[in-house]
């Protein structure tokens, strides 16, 4: 079982609740509202200010950190498919934010804090609790409407190419 609080990631025994191992995150996660995501022997956590950090699931050693160009709160669950993770950020009801695709590959195993570059990003009105569905043909994700309050009711449902981020429909 993996969890996190403040700037600490923890591996916890699911039977006893004992903390088996801890690691240090590059920052905190705004409100810690999403669970960590596991894939390919790694743990991925969305951090405040538009960051995602990858950890070795056994050692909890940092592998890389992604810093999104537009920043934002990490309010979206991280989805995994075919060697990539997908997540979105939120800046406010009236500011744009990115939905990002990141390769899970650790390009430089000698560094624990290497700066991860995105495979692609898609900019829209923000992604607030917008968990994505991903398969080999498309990424399906919802967005904010870009207006203050609940006045328009016109958020979007986007279908994106999972390899390029180009809008399909």
Residue ranges and their predicted role:
Residues 1-169:
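Extracytoplasmic/lumenal domain signature
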